[in-house]
């Protein structure tokens, strides 16, 4: 929806907040929320069931996945599959590896200065049309590279090689 504040969701697990950098990102997002009254709504959720978490995700525009990541994992892929923007690892090497030109992940890096991340987030939240396009491109990326039928076929080929005694394809 284009009306109202941009909703940012940060899913947190007490045992992973430092490892994933979500506590650090929550602090940064809260600062932005204070600086942009009425324009941003930041919500942190902790230890929800998957069903409850997915409901929260569906109500959000942007989901902060993790700061300390090189490529998107399950949470980021779920976020993009549901047509939401994800902030996570999305380094160039990841896109090269999957042979993807579209870069729909708001790339986070612990090497980047927090003030720079904050300004990039501010710019992202100010451009609702850009957010919409990024969300659509994320959905398409997941469809292209993570279709369940394609992944199942990869697993099947791998297991067939194992059964034949050649896990590395040197049949």
Residue map of PLM features:
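C-terminal "capping" alpha-helix adjacent to the active site of nucleotide-linked donor transferases
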Residues: 113-132, 163
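Acidic donor-binding loop of glycosyltransferase active sites
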Residues: 58-71, 84
